[in-house]
Amino acid sequence: MAKEILTFLTGISTRDGDKFPVLISAISKVSESEHRGLLNVITELRKENTPIANHIANHIDSFTNYDFAHLLFSDGTAKNTISLDNQLNIIQVADLVLPDKDTTFDEYTTIELLSVAMLIVISTFALDFIHSDRSIFKIVDLDEAWAFLNVAQGETLSNKLVRAGRAMQAGVYFVTQSSGDVAKESLKNNIGLKFAFRSTDINEIKQTLEFFGIDKDDENNQKRLRDLENGQCLLQDLYGRVGVVQIHPVFEELLHAFDTRPPVQRNEVE
C-alpha cells in the first residue's frame, strides 16, 4: 500500500530507473522497522543524503501540510487505528476534493491527488474487510457514493468491491442521491437489490424507472414513485420483482440517530 500511495503521489513509475529504486528501498527499510509510517519514509530518504533521495523526500514532504494529510502520513505510533477485528468501522472524510471523471491525471491539483490517494486507501481497507472470514456476512456502506463513482479510480474500485462482495459473502451498499450516479453498465449489472425513494423530478423519475428495468414512460409507474410516502420506497429484489415497501424502524433511537434534518425543521415537526 505504501508503494502504491507514494508512487501515485509523486508520479514516480517503475520506468524511472533513477528515482524508483531509491523510493522503494526507503519504503522497504521502513516496512521492516518497528514504527511503520509514511513520515518515516521521508526520514529514511534524508538519511541517504543524495540529490535524488533529498528531492523525493522534499516532494513527499510537500503533501504533509494539507488538512487531512495526517490520515495518510504518520510516524507509525498512531493509536486507535481502524482494524478488521472491529465489528464496526466508520471512516469520515468530509474534505475530500475529488477530480471530475474527465480530468486527466496531469491536470490533478495537489488536493485532488491527496483525495484520490485517500480514496484508494479507504477502498483497499474495504477490500481487505470483504476478503476476511467468508463464513461471516459483511457490509460495506458507501454513503454519498456519487463522490466515489464520479472519479475514474473510484468507479474502478467500486467495481472491485461489488465483484469481491459477491464471492466473499459481503454486501456493498451504494447510497447516493441519483440513480444516474451509477452509470457504468458493468456496475449496474452486479447490483442485486435496488431501493428508490420519492422523487418529484420527472427526469429523475424516468431515470430511476429505467434503472429498475421497467417502463419509464408508463404514467402509473411514474405516479407510484412520485407518490411514495415517508418511510416508503420502491424495491427491486434479487429476482427482478418490483414493489413498494414500508420501512418501520424497530428502535426509535435508530430513527433519531439517522435523522439528517436540520434542528429547526426537526423542532417544527415535533
What is each stretch, according to the model?
Residues 1-163, 225-229, 233-238:
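P-loop NTPase motor domains
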Residues 1-36, 182-270:
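P-loop NTPase motor core of the ASCE superfamily
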